[in-house]
């Protein structure tokens, strides 16, 4: 086809393409030039013509051309600078990029070693922009539901076909799960079936736990699914009762009781030989007792040897006569059931019939030790021994028969010695070992623990422990069995068995203080402290080797004798006469035990037997004169205090100068006593001279320096010299914190609180964890006005001293001073829990109880058990010569009345 010629021609003037075909959307008018002023604003039409005429009429001059050239030159220069800057920037970017390439070159090369799995594990980059808002919107959209018409479902989807495929899939899964179940069900002999009906049994357990709960929280679909599964179980193995029981419990849970009963009835027809399904049927009909009796009778006809069904039949009967009748019928069917024989014995009132019944029961079940024990308990002593002898032949490896024999001997003769019972049990262990029985310590201790609370078994329990320990030791198995006895003792509770084990071990090693301490704790916890004292008395004076035991205890463990005397005195509730008799008895074979003599001195002083006390001192001096015994200076110290108690100061001074200081010239206690005697007599100069000579001979004793400084400060009113004395003592003992404390207390007494605070700060820098310094720091708050820092100081003190009981006490005292008694009580109880032997804590605790009006009976009982011994305030009272023979309770009352 030839090209049309008009396509190569020029269009006519005013030609607009498409306008002939009716095209629209464009203007056919000629575009007008829009006139604007210099600032870009549109010029109105009425001024345009005049403006054009004016511009055309105005001629161009050279200045305009020159200005235009200048501006053009400037624009060229600016353009060149801009271009140069861009080139430099590109060069910098190229350099930076090259540096980056070189920096990451090795990393790029290592990418070759990345495996495919590592590459896939690299997390994808996620968009965190407005993530929370997007998630919130998405959650809102997910919660929205919309109603959709059926027309939206495509017509080519076959719903019936889809349902059939789902049912096929579910059926295949059920068949796979039931494969093992069907296999096990078809096997008539199954000793152990851990995998049989596992799913059904687990589901049964869940239904049993939630049987009382409704299915309100389960959907209809889940309920139908469970029904389908259980139906498949029943269909696969209709003779398995677990499927029927599970289905019935499911319907029971769904509150469809009639359906559940119908299912379980069908199950009873399918599985009449299963006692479980009959019991489930009885449970579902438990409201109808008469029908339950019918069911249990039918069940017993099918299962006459099921003990559970017979026990259920017994429970359904309401009268004892009917119960006994059912029990007798059950025994005809199951004569070897121990529980039925026990029920029969409990229902029988005639003793003769019970004996006959137990005789028959032991013939059917000779291995039942409970029936044998009940049988021998009703027999006479002679007949019981014959019965046990016959059973030893039937059961030659049964150790319980020998234990029953021991109980029989104890019941027949309550005063029988333990040694005879031990011999009987050891004979039994020998016979058992001949028949292949191997005795173990743990097994026999468990047998003893089983008799721990049984009546008339105390001697037998002890004999079992003694017999097994002696048997293991004599049979050569001591190392293998008894090496772990400590671990066994730690796991055992405080009981008669533990006490018996400890007593036997102590008999083998009477000087073991650890075993004695354990025995003391066990007897105290079990409230058998008199048993500890009787055992002590037996070892020391009543056994064949008592002389050897006393000698070993005197040489190796003299503290055990003191423990015996102390516990005896507590048990006698302060009976001084009986305790003094015991002390004299022990002193006869342990004359050099000073602790016993000190205890006797304390008892004679508290009972105010001063003449006997003076005679005892003289007798002690004469008996120990030719022996060098450690602790003699304590004896002299107590004698000086005894003289001071009677105001025999001159005699005390003479005794100190002629005997004490000559025998012990560097004992600081004698210098302190001598100085205190002179001070009490008003001879201040001699008192100061005594302390001064003491500091020269014993310069490392801070008490002498402190006593000397107090003479100058308080008595001689010379605080400057007192400070100098403490400074000299500190120079000779730079690491003794007591000098800092003495200086701080002196400044507080003198009213120099700033100086005292400075000394505390200096001392804490050197001894940051010393509790006594922190106590002084807390005491300064009572004299100053820095209560705002109190909490901070408390926290620092507790942290640095690790909650020391003295710091806890001082915090409680500070709250007591502010009348915050409840808060003070809490801190004082914490301090007491931390250390119960600190006497000052008890004093302030009783003061707080008095302020709060609380009952102190229990607190006094705790106080009597603890017997506090130290604390500044407590020692100041207890070491007072006029109060040295006071009881702890008397000292407590005196201190409580002081404030």
Curated annotation (Swiss-Prot):
Residues 1-65 are annotated as: Disordered. Disulfide bonds: none annotated. Residues 28-51 have a biased composition (Basic and acidic residues). GO terms for cellular component: catalytic step 2 spliceosome; nucleus; spliceosomal complex; U4/U6 snRNP; U4/U6 x U5 tri-snRNP complex; U5 snRNP. The keyword Nucleus applies. It is found in: Nucleus. This is Pre-mRNA-splicing factor 6. It comes from Saccharomyces cerevisiae (strain ATCC 204508 / S288c). The gene is PRP6.
């Amino acid at each position: 086809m030839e090209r049309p010629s008009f396509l190569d021609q020029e269009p006519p003037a005013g030609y607009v393409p498409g306008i002939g075909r009716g095209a629209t959307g464009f203007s056919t008018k000629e575009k007008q030039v829009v006139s604007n002023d210099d600032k870009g604003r549109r010029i109105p039409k009425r001024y345009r013509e005049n403006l054009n005429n004016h511009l055309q009429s105005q001629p161009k001059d050279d200045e305009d051309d020159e200005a235009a050239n200048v501006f053009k030159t400037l624009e060229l220069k600016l353009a060149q600078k801009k271009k140069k800057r861009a080139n430099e920037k590109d060069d910098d970017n190229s350099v930076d990029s090259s540096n980056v390439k070189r920096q990451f070159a090795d990393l790029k090369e290592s990418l070759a070693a990345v495996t495919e799995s590592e590459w896939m594990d690299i997390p994808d980059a996620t968009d965190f922009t407005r993530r929370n808002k997007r998630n919130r919107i998405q959650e809102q959209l997910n919660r929205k539901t919309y109603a959709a018409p059926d027309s939206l479902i495509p017509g080519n989807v076959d719903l019936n076909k889809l349902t059939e495929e789902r049912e096929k899939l579910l059926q295949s899964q059920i068949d796979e799960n039931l494969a093992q179940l069907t296999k096990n069900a078809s096997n008539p002999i199954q000793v152990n079936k851990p995998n049989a009906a596992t799913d059904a049994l687990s589901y049964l357990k869940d239904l049993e736990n939630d049987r009382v709960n409704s299915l309100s929280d389960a959907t209809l679909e889940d309920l139908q699914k469970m029904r389908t599964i259980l139906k498949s179980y029943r269909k696969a193995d209709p003779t398995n009762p677990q499927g029927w029981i599970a289905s019935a419990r499911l319907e029971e849970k769904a509150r469809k009781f009639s359906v559940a009963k119908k299912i379980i009835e069908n199950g009873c027809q399918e599985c009449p030989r299963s006692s479980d399904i009959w019991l489930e049927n009885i449970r579902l009909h438990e409201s109808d007792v008469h029908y339950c009796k019918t069911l249990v009778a039918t069940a017993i006809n099918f299962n006459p040897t099921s003990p559970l069904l017979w026990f259920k039949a017994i429970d359904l009967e309401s009268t004892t006569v009917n119960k006994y009748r059912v029990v007798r019928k059950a025994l005809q069917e199951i004569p070897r059931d121990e529980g039925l024989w026990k029920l029969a014995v409990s229902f029988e009132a005639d003793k003769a019939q019970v004996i006959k019944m137990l005789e028959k029961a032991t013939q059917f079940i000779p291995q039942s030790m409970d029936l044998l024990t009940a049988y021998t308990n009703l027999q006479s002593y002679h007949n019981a021994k014959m019965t046990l002898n016959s059973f030893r032949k039937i059961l030659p490896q049964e150790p319980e028969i020998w234990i029953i024999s021991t109980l029989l001997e104890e019941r027949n003769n309550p005063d029988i010695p333990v040694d005879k019972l031990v011999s009987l049990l050891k004979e039994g262990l020998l016979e058992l070992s001949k028949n292949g029985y191997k005795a173990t310590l743990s097994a026999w201790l468990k047998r003893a623990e089983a008799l721990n609370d049984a009546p008339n078994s105390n001697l037998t329990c002890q004999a079992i422990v003694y017999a097994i320990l002696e048997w293991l030791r004599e049979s050569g198995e001591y190392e293998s069995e008894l090496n772990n006895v400590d671990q066994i003792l730690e796991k055992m509770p405080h009981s008669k068995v533990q006490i018996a084990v400890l007593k036997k071990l102590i008999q083998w090693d009477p000087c073991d203080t650890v075993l004695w301490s354990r025995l003391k704790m066990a007897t105290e916890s079990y409230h058998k402290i008199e048993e500890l004292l009787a055992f002590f008395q037996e070892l020391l004076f009543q056994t064949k080797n008592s002389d050897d035991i006393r000698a070993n205890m005197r040489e190796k463990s003299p503290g055990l004798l003191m423990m015996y005397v102390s516990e005896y005195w507590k048990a006698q509730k302060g009976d001084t006469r009986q305790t003094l008799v015991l002390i004299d008895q022990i002193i006869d074979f342990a004359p050099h035990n000073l602790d016993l003599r000190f205890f006797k001195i304390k008892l004679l002083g508290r009972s105010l037997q001063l003449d006997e006390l003076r005679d005892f001192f003289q007798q002690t001096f004469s008996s120990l004169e030719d022996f060098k015994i450690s602790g003699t200076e304590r004896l002299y110290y107590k004698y000086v205090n005894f003289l001071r108690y009677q105001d025999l100061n001159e005699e005390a001074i003479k005794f100190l100068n002629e005997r004490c200081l000559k025998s012990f010239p560097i004992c600081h206690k004698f210098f302190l006593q001598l100085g205190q005697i002179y001070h009490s007599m008003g001879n201040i100069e001699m008192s100061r001279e005594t302390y001064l000579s003491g500091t020269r001979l014993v310069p490392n004793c801070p008490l002498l320096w402190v006593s000397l400084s107090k003479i100058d400060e308080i008595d001689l009113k010379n605080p400057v010299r007192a400070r100098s004395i403490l400074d000299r003592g500190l120079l000779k003992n730079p690491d003794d914190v007591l000098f800092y404390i003495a200086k701080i207390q002196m400044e507080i007494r003198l009213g120099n609180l700033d100086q005292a605070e400075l000394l505390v700060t200096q001392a804490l820098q050197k001894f940051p964890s010393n509790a006594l310094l922190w106590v002084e720091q807390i005491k300064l708050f009572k004299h100053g006005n820095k209560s705002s820092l109190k909490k901070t100081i408390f926290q620092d003190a507790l942290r640095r001293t690790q909650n020391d009981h003295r710091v806890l006490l001082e915090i409680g005292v500070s709250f007591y001073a502010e009348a915050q008694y409840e808060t003070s009580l809490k801190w004082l109880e914490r301090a007491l829990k931390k250390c119960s032997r600190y006497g000052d804590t008890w004093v302030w605790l009783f003061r707080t109880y008095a302020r709060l009006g609380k009952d102190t009976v229990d607190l006094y009982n705790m106080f009597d058990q603890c017997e506090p011994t130290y604390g500044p305030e407590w020692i100041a009272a207890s070491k007072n010569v006029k109060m040295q023979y006071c009881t702890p309770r008397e000292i407590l009352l005196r201190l409580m009345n002081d404030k």
